[in-house]
From Swiss-Prot:
Succinyl-CoA synthetase functions in the citric acid cycle (TCA), coupling the hydrolysis of succinyl-CoA to the synthesis of either ATP or GTP and thus represents the only step of substrate-level phosphorylation in the TCA. The beta subunit provides nucleotide specificity of the enzyme and binds the substrate succinate, while the binding sites for coenzyme A and phosphate are found in the alpha subunit. The lineage of its organism: Bacteria, Bacillati, Actinomycetota, Actinomycetes, Mycobacteriales. This is Succinate--CoA ligase [ADP-forming] subunit beta. Its cofactor is Mg(2+). InterPro entries: ATP-grasp, ATP-grasp_succ-CoA_synth-type, ATP_grasp_subdomain_1, Succ-CoA_synthase_bsu_CS, SUCC_ACL_C, Succ_CoA_ligase-like_bsu, Succinyl-CoA_synth-like. The keyword Metal-binding applies.
Length: 387
């Protein structure tokens, strides 16, 4: 989960990373009030989860509260790379002597953590990597040893930060590592990390990505969820503990196990080539549970997608036997009632398959069509979606 800058700075404050004081708002009038409270020039910054805010006119210097009002009025509603600005961060403008770059991230290729540090802050780090690679330090971090002050100082030194700021920078770098580890982040980035004329080190910007898989031990992170930006179907699936990703096709997919669901997407896409080019509408993995409640929740999410014209339920019975899945489907259709209004192609195989098929046959629901194989089921679902 990507955070807005103001949310990243909330985590920074929690771990004593120094930042410039400010507040978030969604109104120009409030932006003026915040500027008056700060009593110094401020920066008015669009809160969007994308880069290039400055170039798009989303970051402005305001010398007076009236300037803050004017800039806020202009920035709110601005479209920045498809992201509409709904919130602003009004923060005290800082005097800047130098700008640096620091980040911690997962290095998936080398299966380790990585610190990146550069004296060339305030610009796109990709540009630094391309034009001045020698100015960008990439330092592997041992997950067990972590980052103490000495190692943090070494990271700053390798990033070519001036000798006179190494000690102060090391303190902030260690605290950013604390944010990375204790908040279960996959990215913590500060660009720029600045030195002020009086040699303070401040995180003027902040970019944090949290690992949603760690949500069970980070309940407080739920408050960072941007419900306005989250697809409502994905939000509903998440509330029901379903692994769901919306796609742009017409055939709804329900399966048990990520591997089987991925294979089902491929088979449906292939079958769709013979039926008007229809495609899978989603990824939905119900995992090991196929109870009536789980199946009803899954169908409710999929049928809420207006693009879906048919649904393909593809289940291989293992620990969860096919008869339990079949009972779940029958009961789910009873729970949903008239809301279940799209044809349902069901392919069962594996443990207790004959009993599962018998249960579906006896139920004789008008929407349910059984298929013997995955290929046959995919073909039928694609055919129905193309009608």
């Amino acid at each position: 989960m990507d955070l807005f800058e103001y949310q990243a700075k909330e985590l920074f404050a929690k771990h004593n990373v120094p930042t410039s004081p400010g507040r978030v708002t969604d109104s120009a009038e409030d932006a003026k009030t915040i500027a008056e409270e700060i009593g110094r020039p401020v920066m008015v910054k669009a809160q969007v989860k994308t880069g290039g805010r400055g170039k798009a006119g989303g970051v402005k210097y305001a010398a007076t509260p009236d300037d803050a009002f004017t800039h806020a009025n202009n920035i709110l509603g601005l479209d920045i790379k498809g992201h509409v600005v709904k919130k602003l961060l009004v923060a005290e403008a800082s005097d800047i002597a130098e700008e640096y770059y620091i980040s911690f991230l997962l290095d998936r290729a080398n299966r380790t953590y990585l610190a990146m540090c550069s004296v060339e802050g305030g610009m796109e780090i990709e540009e630094v990597a391309a034009t001045k690679p020698e100015r960008l330090a990439k330092v592997p971090v041992d997950a067990v040893k972590g980052v103490d002050l000495a190692f943090a100082r070494s990271i700053a030194e390798q990033g070519h930060l001036p000798a006179e700021v190494l000690d102060a920078a090391a303190v902030t770098i260690q605290k950013l590592w604390e944010v990375f580890v204790k908040e279960d982040a996959t990215l913590v980035e500060v660009n720029p990390l600045v030195r002020t004329p009086d040699d303070q080190i401040l995180a003027l910007d902040g970019k944090v990505t949290l690992d949603e898989n760690a949500g069970f031990r980070q309940p407080g992170h739920a408050e960072f969820e941007d419900r306005d930006a989250t697809d409502p179907l994905e939000l509903k699936a998440k509330e029901n503990d379903l692994n769901y990703v919306k796609l742009d096709g017409q055939v709804g997919i329900i399966g048990n196990g990520a591997g089987l669901v991925m294979s089902t997407l491929d088979v449906v896409a292939y079958a769709g080539e013979n039926h008007g080019g229809v495609k899978p509408a989603n990824f939905l993995d119900i995992g090991g549970g196929a109870s009536a409640a789980v199946m009803a929740a899954g169908l409710d999410v999929i049928l809420g997608d207006s693009q879906v014209k048919s649904v393909f339920v593809n289940v291989f019975g293992g620990i969860t036997a096919c008869d339990a899945v079949a009972n779940g489907i029958v009961q789910a259709l009873q729970i949903l009632g008239d809301e279940a209004n799209k044809p349902l192609v069901v392919r069962l195989d594996g443990n207790n398959v004959e009993e599962g098929r018998r249960i579906l046959a006896e139920a004789n629901h008008p929407l349910v069509i059984q298929a013997e194989t995955m290929d046959a089921g995919a073909d039928k679902a694609a055919e129905l979606a193309n009608k």
